[in-house]
A protein has these predicted regions:
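Long, highly charged, low-complexity intrinsically disordered interaction regions
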Residues: 2, 10-78
């Protein structure tokens, strides 16, 4: 699991951004991709979801946003 990924934003799509970190482009799902700018450097705090046939990264601009997300997904029934 990654705590965060830092690098340059290379792509922005409706539900994710692509961030370059040492030559590897990570696709990270974010709540508001248009809050990022291509060519700028960011640190994105990440949550790694591992399922049977899926490995996904979810990202947040702040640690507080990530902590809120972790609290929400810990609620039973969601």
């Amino acid at each position: 699991m990654y705590g965060y990924i830092s690098g340059e934003i290379k792509g922005i799509e409706p539900s994710y951004v692509i961030i370059d970190n040492n030559g590897i482009g990570y696709l990270i799902y974010v709540p508001n991709p248009y809050g990022f700018m291509i060519g700028k450097n960011y640190t994105i705090y990440t949550y790694t979801k591992v399922a049977e046939d899926e490995y996904s990264l979810y990202g947040f601009k702040t640690k507080e946003e990530k902590e809120l997300f972790l609290k929400l997904i810990s609620v039973k029934g969601l």
